[in-house]
Amino acid sequence: MYNPVDAVLTKIITNYGIDSFTLRYAICLLGSFPLNAILKRIPEKRIGLKCCFIISMSMFYLFGVLNLVSGFRTLFISTMFTYLISRFYRSKFMPHLNFMFVMGHLAINHIHAQFLNEQTQTTVDITSSQMVLAMKLTSFAWSYYDGSCTSESDFKDLTEHQKSRAVRGHPPLLKFLAYAFFYSTLLTGPSFDYADFDSWLNCEMFRDLPESKKPMRRHHPGERRQIPKNGKLALWKVVQGLAWMILSTLGMKHFPVKYVLDKDGFPTRSFIFRIHYLFLLGFIHRFKYYAAWTISEGSCILCGLGYNGYDSKTQKIRWDRVRNIDIWTVETAQNTREMLEAWNMNTNKWLKYSVYLRVTKKGKKPGFRSTLFTFLTSAFWHGTRPGYYLTFATGALYQTCGKIYRRNFRPIFLREDGVTPLPSKKIYDLVGIYAIKLAFGYMVQPFIILDLKPSLMVWGSVYFYVHIIVAFSFFLFRGPYAKQVTEFFKSKQPKEIFIRKQKKLEKDISASSPNLGGILKAKIEHEKGKTAEEEEMNLGIPPIELEKWDNAKEDWEDFCKDYKEWRNKNGLEIEEENLSKAFERFKQEFSNAASGSGERVRKMSFSGYSPKPISKKEE
Protein backbone atom coordinates (compact mmCIF):
# COMPACT_ATOMS: atom_id res chain seq x y z
CA MET A 1 0.00 0.00 0.00
CA TYR A 2 1.36 3.39 -1.05
CA ASN A 3 2.40 5.66 1.81
CA PRO A 4 3.00 9.26 0.65
CA VAL A 5 4.65 10.32 3.92
CA ASP A 6 7.01 7.34 3.85
CA ALA A 7 7.80 8.02 0.18
CA VAL A 8 8.87 11.60 0.96
CA LEU A 9 10.97 10.52 3.95
CA THR A 10 12.63 7.72 1.97
CA LYS A 11 13.56 10.22 -0.74
CA ILE A 12 15.12 12.57 1.82
CA ILE A 13 17.03 9.69 3.40
CA THR A 14 18.34 8.55 0.02
CA ASN A 15 19.30 12.02 -1.25
CA TYR A 16 20.97 13.31 1.91
CA GLY A 17 22.27 10.08 3.47
CA ILE A 18 20.41 10.63 6.74
CA ASP A 19 19.93 7.68 9.07
CA SER A 20 16.33 6.45 8.72
CA PHE A 21 15.85 5.58 12.38
CA THR A 22 17.16 8.96 13.60
CA LEU A 23 15.10 11.01 11.12
CA ARG A 24 11.81 9.24 11.79
CA TYR A 25 12.20 9.28 15.56
CA ALA A 26 13.27 12.93 15.52
CA ILE A 27 10.14 13.87 13.55
CA CYS A 28 7.94 12.03 16.06
CA LEU A 29 9.67 13.49 19.11
CA LEU A 30 9.92 17.09 17.88
CA GLY A 31 6.64 17.00 15.97
CA SER A 32 4.74 16.51 19.22
CA PHE A 33 5.50 20.10 20.28
CA PRO A 34 3.43 21.93 17.63
CA LEU A 35 0.76 19.25 18.03
CA ASN A 36 0.65 19.86 21.79
CA ALA A 37 0.32 23.59 21.19
CA ILE A 38 -2.90 22.75 19.34
CA LEU A 39 -4.05 20.13 21.87
CA LYS A 40 -3.82 22.43 24.89
CA ARG A 41 -6.05 24.97 23.11
CA ILE A 42 -8.91 22.56 22.51
CA PRO A 43 -11.76 23.58 24.89
CA GLU A 44 -11.52 21.78 28.23
CA LYS A 45 -15.01 20.31 27.99
CA ARG A 46 -14.44 18.76 24.56
CA ILE A 47 -13.00 15.53 25.97
CA GLY A 48 -14.03 13.44 22.97
CA LEU A 49 -12.37 15.87 20.56
CA LYS A 50 -9.14 15.77 22.59
CA CYS A 51 -9.13 11.97 22.52
CA CYS A 52 -9.79 11.87 18.77
CA PHE A 53 -6.93 14.33 18.19
CA ILE A 54 -4.52 12.24 20.32
CA ILE A 55 -5.41 8.97 18.59
CA SER A 56 -5.29 10.56 15.11
CA MET A 57 -1.80 11.94 15.67
CA SER A 58 -0.58 8.58 16.97
CA MET A 59 -1.97 6.88 13.87
CA PHE A 60 -0.15 9.46 11.74
CA TYR A 61 3.08 8.57 13.55
CA LEU A 62 2.61 4.80 13.25
CA PHE A 63 1.18 4.56 9.74
CA GLY A 64 2.68 7.66 8.13
CA VAL A 65 6.06 8.53 9.63
CA LEU A 66 7.17 5.11 10.91
CA ASN A 67 5.29 2.98 8.35
CA LEU A 68 4.54 0.42 11.06
CA VAL A 69 1.23 -1.25 10.25
CA SER A 70 2.34 -4.41 12.04
CA GLY A 71 3.53 -2.25 14.93
CA PHE A 72 0.07 -0.78 15.35
CA ARG A 73 -1.40 -4.28 15.35
CA THR A 74 1.00 -5.31 18.11
CA LEU A 75 0.10 -2.36 20.33
CA PHE A 76 -3.62 -2.67 19.59
CA ILE A 77 -3.75 -6.35 20.60
CA SER A 78 -2.29 -5.68 24.05
CA THR A 79 -4.43 -2.58 24.51
CA MET A 80 -7.71 -4.28 23.65
CA PHE A 81 -6.91 -7.33 25.76
CA THR A 82 -6.40 -5.15 28.83
CA TYR A 83 -9.51 -3.12 28.05
CA LEU A 84 -11.77 -6.14 27.62
CA ILE A 85 -10.44 -8.30 30.44
CA SER A 86 -10.57 -5.44 32.95
CA ARG A 87 -14.10 -4.54 31.83
CA PHE A 88 -15.69 -7.99 31.84
CA TYR A 89 -13.58 -10.39 33.95
CA ARG A 90 -14.56 -9.93 37.60
CA SER A 91 -11.90 -11.81 39.55
CA LYS A 92 -9.05 -11.10 41.91
CA PHE A 93 -6.83 -12.80 39.32
CA MET A 94 -7.69 -10.25 36.63
CA PRO A 95 -4.56 -8.06 37.16
CA HIS A 96 -2.36 -11.18 37.28
CA LEU A 97 -3.82 -12.64 34.08
CA ASN A 98 -3.48 -9.29 32.36
CA PHE A 99 0.14 -9.01 33.50
CA MET A 100 0.95 -12.48 32.16
CA PHE A 101 -0.63 -11.78 28.77
CA VAL A 102 0.90 -8.32 28.28
CA MET A 103 4.38 -9.44 29.36
CA GLY A 104 4.06 -12.68 27.38
CA HIS A 105 3.08 -10.71 24.28
CA LEU A 106 6.07 -8.44 24.84
CA ALA A 107 8.35 -11.47 25.26
CA ILE A 108 7.16 -12.95 21.96
CA ASN A 109 8.03 -9.73 20.17
CA HIS A 110 11.40 -9.52 21.93
CA ILE A 111 12.21 -13.03 20.70
CA HIS A 112 10.91 -12.24 17.21
CA ALA A 113 13.03 -9.08 17.05
CA GLN A 114 16.12 -11.00 18.19
CA PHE A 115 15.90 -14.15 16.07
CA LEU A 116 13.45 -13.62 13.20
CA ASN A 117 13.24 -9.95 12.31
CA GLU A 118 15.77 -8.70 9.78
CA GLN A 119 16.45 -5.07 10.53
CA THR A 120 16.99 -2.77 7.55
CA GLN A 121 17.46 0.97 7.22
CA THR A 122 13.75 1.43 6.48
CA THR A 123 12.36 -0.52 9.46
CA VAL A 124 11.85 0.62 13.02
CA ASP A 125 11.40 -1.84 15.90
CA ILE A 126 8.12 -1.48 17.80
CA THR A 127 9.25 -3.28 20.97
CA SER A 128 10.42 -0.06 22.66
CA SER A 129 6.89 1.34 22.30
CA GLN A 130 5.45 -1.95 23.53
CA MET A 131 7.68 -1.77 26.61
CA VAL A 132 6.19 1.62 27.50
CA LEU A 133 2.68 0.34 26.79
CA ALA A 134 3.23 -2.74 28.98
CA MET A 135 3.88 -0.49 31.99
CA LYS A 136 0.73 1.52 31.28
CA LEU A 137 -1.55 -1.48 30.80
CA THR A 138 -0.37 -3.51 33.79
CA SER A 139 -0.54 -0.51 36.14
CA PHE A 140 -4.02 0.33 34.82
CA ALA A 141 -5.29 -3.19 35.56
CA TRP A 142 -4.12 -2.90 39.17
CA SER A 143 -5.50 0.62 39.56
CA TYR A 144 -8.89 -0.42 38.18
CA TYR A 145 -8.97 -3.50 40.42
CA ASP A 146 -8.14 -1.35 43.46
CA GLY A 147 -10.77 1.26 42.68
CA SER A 148 -13.66 -0.73 41.24
CA CYS A 149 -13.36 -4.39 42.16
CA THR A 150 -12.60 -4.18 45.88
CA SER A 151 -15.10 -3.72 48.70
CA GLU A 152 -15.09 -0.56 50.82
CA SER A 153 -13.42 -2.40 53.71
CA ASP A 154 -10.66 -3.73 51.43
CA PHE A 155 -10.23 -0.29 49.87
CA LYS A 156 -9.45 1.18 53.28
CA ASP A 157 -6.59 -1.33 53.64
CA LEU A 158 -4.87 -0.07 50.49
CA THR A 159 -1.77 2.12 50.73
CA GLU A 160 -2.08 5.86 50.16
CA HIS A 161 -0.35 5.47 46.80
CA GLN A 162 -2.82 2.79 45.70
CA LYS A 163 -5.77 4.92 46.78
CA SER A 164 -4.47 7.95 44.89
CA ARG A 165 -4.08 5.89 41.70
CA ALA A 166 -7.32 3.89 42.00
CA VAL A 167 -9.72 4.05 39.03
CA ARG A 168 -13.31 4.05 40.25
CA GLY A 169 -15.12 3.47 36.94
CA HIS A 170 -14.11 1.71 33.75
CA PRO A 171 -13.11 4.31 31.15
CA PRO A 172 -14.79 4.74 27.77
CA LEU A 173 -12.99 3.00 24.93
CA LEU A 174 -12.07 6.28 23.23
CA LYS A 175 -10.47 7.67 26.37
CA PHE A 176 -8.62 4.40 27.04
CA LEU A 177 -7.20 4.34 23.50
CA ALA A 178 -6.08 7.95 23.93
CA TYR A 179 -4.31 6.91 27.15
CA ALA A 180 -2.61 3.91 25.52
CA PHE A 181 -1.67 5.74 22.30
CA PHE A 182 -0.72 9.15 23.70
CA TYR A 183 1.56 10.39 20.91
CA SER A 184 3.99 12.43 23.06
CA THR A 185 5.15 9.30 24.91
CA LEU A 186 4.28 6.64 22.35
CA LEU A 187 7.85 5.80 21.34
CA THR A 188 10.13 6.53 24.28
CA GLY A 189 7.87 7.04 27.26
CA PRO A 190 7.71 8.09 29.99
CA SER A 191 4.93 5.90 31.31
CA PHE A 192 2.26 7.41 33.56
CA ASP A 193 -0.81 6.23 35.46
CA TYR A 194 -4.31 6.40 34.04
CA ALA A 195 -5.45 8.46 37.05
CA ASP A 196 -2.96 11.19 36.08
CA PHE A 197 -4.02 11.07 32.42
CA ASP A 198 -7.72 11.29 33.30
CA SER A 199 -7.10 14.14 35.75
CA TRP A 200 -5.16 16.02 33.06
CA LEU A 201 -7.72 15.32 30.33
CA ASN A 202 -10.54 16.68 32.51
CA CYS A 203 -8.29 19.54 33.72
CA GLU A 204 -8.92 18.49 37.34
CA MET A 205 -5.21 18.45 38.16
CA PHE A 206 -5.08 22.25 37.78
CA ARG A 207 -7.65 22.95 40.50
CA ASP A 208 -5.00 24.08 43.00
CA LEU A 209 -3.60 26.65 40.55
CA PRO A 210 -4.61 30.28 41.31
CA GLU A 211 -6.72 31.94 38.63
CA SER A 212 -4.06 34.63 38.22
CA LYS A 213 -1.64 31.97 36.95
CA LYS A 214 -4.01 30.79 34.22
CA PRO A 215 -3.63 32.54 30.84
CA MET A 216 -6.49 34.45 29.23
CA ARG A 217 -8.13 33.01 26.12
CA ARG A 218 -7.22 35.05 23.08
CA HIS A 219 -10.55 34.67 21.29
CA HIS A 220 -12.78 34.52 24.38
CA PRO A 221 -12.25 37.66 26.50
CA GLY A 222 -12.89 37.11 30.18
CA GLU A 223 -12.24 33.35 30.01
CA ARG A 224 -9.05 31.61 31.11
CA ARG A 225 -7.32 28.42 29.97
CA GLN A 226 -6.78 25.85 32.70
CA ILE A 227 -3.27 24.88 31.55
CA PRO A 228 -0.70 27.52 32.56
CA LYS A 229 1.94 28.86 30.20
CA ASN A 230 5.09 26.76 30.05
CA GLY A 231 6.55 27.37 26.60
CA LYS A 232 9.94 28.59 27.83
CA LEU A 233 10.52 25.54 30.03
CA ALA A 234 9.42 23.20 27.24
CA LEU A 235 11.77 24.98 24.81
CA TRP A 236 14.64 24.64 27.28
CA LYS A 237 13.98 20.89 27.47
CA VAL A 238 14.12 20.70 23.66
CA VAL A 239 17.44 22.57 23.59
CA GLN A 240 18.86 20.19 26.19
CA GLY A 241 17.59 17.17 24.29
CA LEU A 242 19.08 18.34 21.00
CA ALA A 243 22.40 19.04 22.74
CA TRP A 244 22.45 15.50 24.14
CA MET A 245 21.56 14.17 20.69
CA ILE A 246 24.50 16.00 19.10
CA LEU A 247 26.87 14.87 21.85
CA SER A 248 25.67 11.30 21.39
CA THR A 249 26.36 11.39 17.65
CA LEU A 250 29.81 12.95 18.07
CA GLY A 251 30.71 10.71 21.00
CA MET A 252 29.86 7.50 19.17
CA LYS A 253 31.87 8.72 16.20
CA HIS A 254 35.04 9.39 18.22
CA PHE A 255 34.64 6.56 20.75
CA PRO A 256 33.14 3.65 18.79
CA VAL A 257 32.04 0.44 20.48
CA LYS A 258 33.76 -1.62 17.81
CA TYR A 259 37.16 -0.54 19.18
CA VAL A 260 36.70 -2.60 22.37
CA LEU A 261 35.94 -5.62 20.16
CA ASP A 262 39.22 -5.23 18.29
CA LYS A 263 41.30 -8.16 19.56
CA ASP A 264 44.51 -6.71 18.18
CA GLY A 265 44.09 -3.09 19.27
CA PHE A 266 42.22 -2.68 22.53
CA PRO A 267 44.01 -5.33 24.67
CA THR A 268 47.38 -3.78 23.81
CA ARG A 269 46.51 -0.53 25.59
CA SER A 270 47.25 -0.08 29.29
CA PHE A 271 44.81 -1.35 31.91
CA ILE A 272 44.15 2.22 33.12
CA PHE A 273 43.27 3.28 29.56
CA ARG A 274 40.96 0.31 29.04
CA ILE A 275 38.86 0.77 32.19
CA HIS A 276 38.46 4.49 31.46
CA TYR A 277 37.54 3.79 27.84
CA LEU A 278 34.74 1.53 29.10
CA PHE A 279 33.65 4.37 31.38
CA LEU A 280 33.51 6.75 28.40
CA LEU A 281 31.49 4.25 26.35
CA GLY A 282 28.93 3.91 29.14
CA PHE A 283 28.84 7.69 29.60
CA ILE A 284 28.29 8.36 25.88
CA HIS A 285 25.72 5.58 25.60
CA ARG A 286 23.57 7.38 28.21
CA PHE A 287 23.37 10.50 26.03
CA LYS A 288 20.74 9.07 23.67
CA TYR A 289 18.52 8.24 26.65
CA TYR A 290 19.03 11.74 28.02
CA ALA A 291 18.01 13.17 24.64
CA ALA A 292 14.86 11.07 24.20
CA TRP A 293 13.62 11.37 27.78
CA THR A 294 14.34 15.10 28.05
CA ILE A 295 12.52 15.91 24.80
CA SER A 296 9.52 13.72 25.67
CA GLU A 297 9.38 15.32 29.13
CA GLY A 298 9.36 18.74 27.47
CA SER A 299 6.49 17.62 25.26
CA CYS A 300 4.49 16.48 28.30
CA ILE A 301 5.22 19.79 30.01
CA LEU A 302 3.95 21.76 27.02
CA CYS A 303 0.60 19.94 26.91
CA GLY A 304 0.24 20.25 30.71
CA LEU A 305 0.62 16.57 31.63
CA GLY A 306 3.86 17.35 33.47
CA TYR A 307 2.07 19.64 35.94
CA ASN A 308 2.72 18.50 39.53
CA GLY A 309 1.14 21.17 41.68
CA TYR A 310 1.54 24.79 42.71
CA ASP A 311 3.76 25.83 45.62
CA SER A 312 2.03 28.76 47.32
CA LYS A 313 5.15 29.60 49.36
CA THR A 314 7.52 30.02 46.44
CA GLN A 315 4.66 30.85 44.02
CA LYS A 316 6.18 28.46 41.52
CA ILE A 317 4.69 25.62 39.49
CA ARG A 318 6.24 22.14 39.61
CA TRP A 319 6.51 20.41 36.24
CA ASP A 320 8.09 17.09 37.23
CA ARG A 321 5.07 14.73 37.29
CA VAL A 322 6.34 12.56 34.41
CA ARG A 323 10.06 13.22 34.86
CA ASN A 324 12.01 10.11 33.90
CA ILE A 325 15.62 11.12 34.46
CA ASP A 326 17.57 13.31 36.89
CA ILE A 327 20.75 13.75 34.86
CA TRP A 328 22.72 15.64 37.50
CA THR A 329 22.03 13.03 40.17
CA VAL A 330 22.87 10.16 37.80
CA GLU A 331 26.25 11.68 37.00
CA THR A 332 27.15 12.80 40.54
CA ALA A 333 25.58 10.02 42.63
CA GLN A 334 27.72 8.92 45.58
CA ASN A 335 26.19 5.45 45.81
CA THR A 336 24.50 2.89 43.58
CA ARG A 337 21.00 3.28 45.00
CA GLU A 338 21.03 7.04 44.52
CA MET A 339 22.08 6.62 40.90
CA LEU A 340 19.48 3.96 40.09
CA GLU A 341 16.67 5.96 41.70
CA ALA A 342 17.45 8.87 39.36
CA TRP A 343 17.58 6.66 36.24
CA ASN A 344 14.43 5.63 34.34
CA MET A 345 12.39 6.80 37.31
CA ASN A 346 8.94 5.82 36.02
CA THR A 347 10.08 2.27 35.30
CA ASN A 348 11.37 2.09 38.86
CA LYS A 349 7.96 3.18 40.15
CA TRP A 350 6.24 0.60 37.97
CA LEU A 351 8.48 -2.19 39.25
CA LYS A 352 7.84 -1.15 42.83
CA TYR A 353 4.08 -0.60 42.74
CA SER A 354 3.01 -3.13 40.09
CA VAL A 355 5.42 -5.99 40.83
CA TYR A 356 7.43 -5.76 44.06
CA LEU A 357 4.58 -4.84 46.41
CA ARG A 358 1.90 -6.77 44.49
CA VAL A 359 3.48 -10.21 44.87
CA THR A 360 3.97 -9.67 48.60
CA LYS A 361 1.51 -11.63 50.70
CA LYS A 362 -0.95 -9.45 52.58
CA GLY A 363 0.23 -8.72 56.10
CA LYS A 364 3.87 -9.63 55.37
CA LYS A 365 6.96 -7.67 54.41
CA PRO A 366 8.49 -8.09 50.94
CA GLY A 367 11.01 -10.92 50.89
CA PHE A 368 12.54 -13.47 48.56
CA ARG A 369 9.49 -13.77 46.32
CA SER A 370 9.21 -10.00 45.78
CA THR A 371 12.93 -9.65 45.07
CA LEU A 372 13.00 -12.56 42.63
CA PHE A 373 9.90 -11.51 40.67
CA THR A 374 11.08 -7.91 40.45
CA PHE A 375 14.53 -8.95 39.25
CA LEU A 376 13.12 -11.28 36.58
CA THR A 377 10.49 -8.78 35.43
CA SER A 378 13.06 -5.99 35.18
CA ALA A 379 15.44 -8.11 33.11
CA PHE A 380 12.76 -9.77 30.97
CA TRP A 381 11.03 -6.44 30.28
CA HIS A 382 14.20 -5.15 28.62
CA GLY A 383 14.47 -8.13 26.29
CA THR A 384 15.87 -11.60 25.78
CA ARG A 385 19.40 -10.69 24.70
CA PRO A 386 22.13 -12.24 26.92
CA GLY A 387 23.73 -8.86 27.52
CA TYR A 388 20.77 -7.63 29.54
CA TYR A 389 21.02 -10.54 31.96
CA LEU A 390 24.79 -10.20 32.35
CA THR A 391 24.37 -6.54 33.25
CA PHE A 392 21.45 -7.09 35.63
CA ALA A 393 23.02 -10.06 37.42
CA THR A 394 26.31 -8.21 37.89
CA GLY A 395 24.45 -5.06 38.88
CA ALA A 396 22.54 -6.95 41.56
CA LEU A 397 25.77 -8.25 43.08
CA TYR A 398 27.44 -4.85 42.80
CA GLN A 399 24.54 -3.06 44.48
CA THR A 400 24.74 -5.45 47.42
CA CYS A 401 28.49 -4.89 47.57
CA GLY A 402 27.94 -1.12 47.48
CA LYS A 403 25.55 -1.33 50.43
CA ILE A 404 28.16 -3.27 52.39
CA TYR A 405 30.83 -0.62 51.81
CA ARG A 406 28.42 2.24 52.49
CA ARG A 407 27.31 0.65 55.77
CA ASN A 408 30.89 0.12 56.95
CA PHE A 409 32.86 3.01 55.40
CA ARG A 410 30.48 5.99 55.36
CA PRO A 411 30.02 6.28 59.17
CA ILE A 412 33.81 6.72 59.50
CA PHE A 413 33.45 10.12 57.83
CA LEU A 414 30.51 11.33 59.95
CA ARG A 415 30.52 12.90 63.39
CA GLU A 416 29.09 11.32 66.55
CA ASP A 417 25.50 12.18 65.59
CA GLY A 418 25.84 10.02 62.45
CA VAL A 419 24.63 12.89 60.23
CA THR A 420 27.09 15.79 60.28
CA PRO A 421 29.96 15.17 57.82
CA LEU A 422 33.60 15.47 58.77
CA PRO A 423 35.88 17.54 56.49
CA SER A 424 37.33 14.28 55.15
CA LYS A 425 33.90 13.19 53.83
CA LYS A 426 34.49 15.26 50.69
CA ILE A 427 37.30 12.87 49.79
CA TYR A 428 34.99 9.90 50.49
CA ASP A 429 32.32 11.42 48.22
CA LEU A 430 34.75 12.04 45.35
CA VAL A 431 36.17 8.52 45.60
CA GLY A 432 32.62 7.13 45.69
CA ILE A 433 31.56 9.02 42.55
CA TYR A 434 34.72 7.93 40.72
CA ALA A 435 34.33 4.27 41.76
CA ILE A 436 30.66 4.16 40.73
CA LYS A 437 31.39 5.63 37.31
CA LEU A 438 34.16 3.11 36.62
CA ALA A 439 32.05 0.21 37.88
CA PHE A 440 29.01 1.18 35.82
CA GLY A 441 31.18 1.69 32.75
CA TYR A 442 32.26 -1.93 33.19
CA MET A 443 28.82 -3.34 34.00
CA VAL A 444 26.86 -1.76 31.12
CA GLN A 445 29.09 -3.09 28.34
CA PRO A 446 26.90 -6.20 27.79
CA PHE A 447 23.86 -3.88 27.78
CA ILE A 448 25.48 -2.01 24.88
CA ILE A 449 26.93 -5.01 23.02
CA LEU A 450 23.99 -7.38 23.79
CA ASP A 451 25.64 -10.62 22.58
CA LEU A 452 27.16 -13.11 25.03
CA LYS A 453 30.60 -13.92 23.60
CA PRO A 454 31.66 -10.33 22.72
CA SER A 455 30.44 -9.11 26.12
CA LEU A 456 32.55 -11.67 27.97
CA MET A 457 35.49 -10.84 25.72
CA VAL A 458 35.29 -7.14 26.68
CA TRP A 459 35.06 -7.99 30.37
CA GLY A 460 37.98 -10.36 29.93
CA SER A 461 40.07 -7.58 28.38
CA VAL A 462 40.01 -5.83 31.77
CA TYR A 463 40.44 -9.10 33.69
CA PHE A 464 36.87 -9.12 35.10
CA TYR A 465 38.16 -6.68 37.69
CA VAL A 466 34.75 -5.58 39.01
CA HIS A 467 33.67 -9.20 39.48
CA ILE A 468 36.91 -9.91 41.35
CA ILE A 469 36.40 -6.89 43.63
CA VAL A 470 32.81 -7.97 44.33
CA ALA A 471 33.86 -11.56 45.08
CA PHE A 472 36.65 -10.39 47.38
CA SER A 473 34.25 -8.03 49.17
CA PHE A 474 31.75 -10.83 49.76
CA PHE A 475 34.54 -13.02 51.13
CA LEU A 476 35.71 -10.19 53.38
CA PHE A 477 32.32 -9.18 54.80
CA ARG A 478 30.38 -12.43 54.45
CA GLY A 479 33.14 -15.00 54.85
CA PRO A 480 34.77 -16.65 57.86
CA TYR A 481 36.39 -13.40 59.04
CA ALA A 482 33.28 -11.23 58.61
CA LYS A 483 32.85 -10.56 62.33
CA GLN A 484 36.43 -9.40 62.81
CA VAL A 485 36.36 -7.20 59.67
CA THR A 486 33.05 -5.59 60.63
CA GLU A 487 34.27 -5.01 64.18
CA PHE A 488 37.42 -3.33 62.86
CA PHE A 489 35.44 -0.82 60.80
CA LYS A 490 33.03 -0.14 63.66
CA SER A 491 35.98 0.71 65.88
CA LYS A 492 36.81 3.56 63.46
CA GLN A 493 33.27 5.04 63.36
CA PRO A 494 32.76 8.12 65.64
CA LYS A 495 29.09 7.30 66.24
CA GLU A 496 29.83 3.71 67.21
CA ILE A 497 32.65 4.84 69.52
CA PHE A 498 30.27 7.31 71.20
CA ILE A 499 27.53 4.66 71.58
CA ARG A 500 29.95 2.20 73.17
CA LYS A 501 31.14 4.82 75.65
CA GLN A 502 27.53 5.72 76.43
CA LYS A 503 26.57 2.09 76.99
CA LYS A 504 29.55 1.57 79.28
CA LEU A 505 28.55 4.63 81.29
CA GLU A 506 24.93 3.44 81.52
CA LYS A 507 26.11 0.00 82.60
CA ASP A 508 28.21 1.51 85.39
CA ILE A 509 25.26 3.67 86.52
CA SER A 510 22.96 0.65 86.42
CA ALA A 511 25.31 -1.31 88.65
CA SER A 512 25.50 1.49 91.24
CA SER A 513 21.76 2.42 91.16
CA PRO A 514 19.27 -0.43 90.52
CA ASN A 515 16.22 1.88 90.10
CA LEU A 516 17.93 4.08 87.56
CA GLY A 517 19.32 0.97 85.90
CA GLY A 518 15.80 -0.31 85.21
CA ILE A 519 14.93 2.95 83.44
CA LEU A 520 18.10 2.80 81.34
CA LYS A 521 17.41 -0.83 80.43
CA ALA A 522 13.92 0.09 79.19
CA LYS A 523 15.44 2.96 77.18
CA ILE A 524 17.94 0.61 75.50
CA GLU A 525 15.18 -1.88 74.59
CA HIS A 526 13.11 0.96 73.12
CA GLU A 527 16.02 2.13 70.96
CA LYS A 528 16.54 -1.41 69.67
CA GLY A 529 12.96 -1.44 68.45
CA LYS A 530 13.44 1.87 66.64
CA THR A 531 16.47 0.70 64.72
CA ALA A 532 14.55 -1.82 62.64
CA GLU A 533 14.42 -0.41 59.14
CA GLU A 534 11.31 -0.65 57.03
CA GLU A 535 11.63 -3.14 54.20
CA GLU A 536 12.03 -1.21 50.98
CA MET A 537 12.54 -2.16 47.40
CA ASN A 538 15.86 -1.27 45.87
CA LEU A 539 14.74 0.59 42.77
CA GLY A 540 16.17 -0.38 39.41
CA ILE A 541 18.07 -3.58 40.21
CA PRO A 542 17.07 -5.57 43.30
CA PRO A 543 20.22 -6.53 45.23
CA ILE A 544 21.12 -10.07 46.10
CA GLU A 545 20.99 -9.93 49.90
CA LEU A 546 22.03 -13.44 50.82
CA GLU A 547 20.68 -13.25 54.35
CA LYS A 548 17.24 -12.22 53.03
CA TRP A 549 17.11 -15.11 50.60
CA ASP A 550 17.07 -17.55 53.50
CA ASN A 551 13.27 -17.24 53.63
CA ALA A 552 12.91 -18.68 50.11
CA LYS A 553 11.76 -22.00 51.54
CA GLU A 554 9.21 -20.24 53.74
CA ASP A 555 7.85 -18.30 50.76
CA TRP A 556 7.57 -21.49 48.72
CA GLU A 557 5.72 -23.26 51.55
CA ASP A 558 3.33 -20.30 51.84
CA PHE A 559 2.69 -20.44 48.11
CA CYS A 560 1.97 -24.19 48.21
CA LYS A 561 -0.32 -23.71 51.20
CA ASP A 562 -2.24 -20.91 49.46
CA TYR A 563 -2.56 -22.95 46.28
CA LYS A 564 -3.84 -26.00 48.17
CA GLU A 565 -6.36 -23.87 50.04
CA TRP A 566 -7.52 -22.25 46.78
CA ARG A 567 -7.88 -25.65 45.12
CA ASN A 568 -9.85 -27.07 48.06
CA LYS A 569 -12.27 -24.15 47.72
CA ASN A 570 -12.87 -25.15 44.07
CA GLY A 571 -10.85 -22.16 42.90
CA LEU A 572 -10.34 -23.53 39.39
CA GLU A 573 -14.06 -24.17 38.92
CA ILE A 574 -14.88 -20.67 40.20
CA GLU A 575 -12.42 -19.06 37.77
CA GLU A 576 -13.85 -21.08 34.89
CA GLU A 577 -17.27 -19.77 35.87
CA ASN A 578 -15.91 -16.21 36.10
CA LEU A 579 -14.43 -16.49 32.60
CA SER A 580 -17.71 -17.87 31.29
CA LYS A 581 -19.60 -14.97 32.89
CA ALA A 582 -17.12 -12.50 31.41
CA PHE A 583 -17.76 -13.89 27.94
CA GLU A 584 -21.52 -13.72 28.49
CA ARG A 585 -21.26 -10.09 29.60
CA PHE A 586 -19.17 -9.34 26.53
CA LYS A 587 -21.72 -10.95 24.19
CA GLN A 588 -24.64 -9.30 25.96
CA GLU A 589 -23.19 -5.80 25.70
CA PHE A 590 -22.36 -6.14 22.02
CA SER A 591 -25.66 -7.81 21.14
CA ASN A 592 -27.54 -5.00 22.88
CA ALA A 593 -25.51 -2.44 20.99
CA ALA A 594 -25.99 -4.21 17.66
CA SER A 595 -29.75 -4.50 18.09
CA GLY A 596 -30.19 -0.98 19.46
CA SER A 597 -29.90 2.51 18.10
CA GLY A 598 -26.75 4.37 17.17
CA GLU A 599 -26.95 6.13 20.51
CA ARG A 600 -26.59 2.78 22.31
CA VAL A 601 -23.48 1.96 20.30
CA ARG A 602 -22.10 5.36 21.19
CA LYS A 603 -22.90 4.77 24.85
CA MET A 604 -21.06 1.45 24.85
CA SER A 605 -17.89 3.09 23.56
CA PHE A 606 -17.93 6.47 25.22
CA SER A 607 -19.52 6.03 28.64
CA GLY A 608 -17.97 4.72 31.80
CA TYR A 609 -18.66 1.32 33.28
CA SER A 610 -18.19 0.29 36.89
CA PRO A 611 -18.88 -3.26 38.11
CA LYS A 612 -19.88 -4.28 41.58
CA PRO A 613 -17.13 -5.33 44.02
CA ILE A 614 -16.00 -8.93 43.68
CA SER A 615 -17.97 -11.23 45.95
CA LYS A 616 -16.41 -13.92 48.10
CA LYS A 617 -17.78 -16.56 45.75
CA GLU A 618 -16.05 -14.98 42.75
CA GLU A 619 -12.73 -14.96 44.59
From Swiss-Prot:
BP term (GO), one: phosphatidylethanolamine biosynthetic process
Coiled-coil ranges per UniProt: 545-593
Cystine pairings recorded for this chain: none
Membrane topology qualifier: Multi-pass membrane protein
GO molecular function: 1-acylglycerol-3-phosphate O-acyltransferase activity; 1-acylglycerophosphocholine O-acyltransferase activity; 1-acylglycerophosphoethanolamine O-acyltransferase activity; 1-acylglycerophosphoserine O-acyltransferase activity; lysophosphatidylethanolamine acyltransferase activity; O-acyltransferase activity
Sequence segments annotated as region (Disordered): 592-619
Segments on the Cytoplasmic face: 40-51, 114-231, 296-429, 478-619
UniProt similarity note: Belongs to the membrane-bound acyltransferase family.
Name used for this protein in its record: Lysophospholipid acyltransferase
Species assigned in the record: Saccharomyces cerevisiae (strain ATCC 204508 / S288c)
